[in-house]
Amino acid sequence: MLLWRASIPGDWLPKVLADLNGVLVDHCHLERKAATSALNLIKYPELVDHVKELNQIAQEELEHFNLLFDLLKTRGVPFGLPQASPWIGGVMKFIRKGRREQVIDHLIAASLIEGRSCEKFQILAEALKETEPDISKMYANLVESEGGHYSHFWLMA
């Protein structure tokens, strides 16, 4: 577990478990957005030494997207439209203006988003062991990857 100033709200897990299919759709869209974000960071000349690393992260996020998309199809769940995340929107609104600040803040924001995802995936993996073992295993497998993305973005910043 990562150490955060604020923990995940206590009502988060019951809400997720009550609408697991909706959460899977949302997660699928978020993986696509994460891939796009990693690719968008390549535009900054300050990150030229990290282009391959960012490209690798984007590829991994697209693999996660495909994994979730296939899971949705298997479960007969419609893909649906993406939903805005108030938490992610809140993180992104603190990105400062100015080239240097923007680069650093985008990397920190990406790190925070990946880190929180890692924490939530650990909770989901444990909570779904008995009722949804395949999904539990998927989330357990995603923990390492998301944790790696968290640290890569943090170190780039």
Predicted regions and their residues:
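Non-heme di-metal
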Residues: 1-157
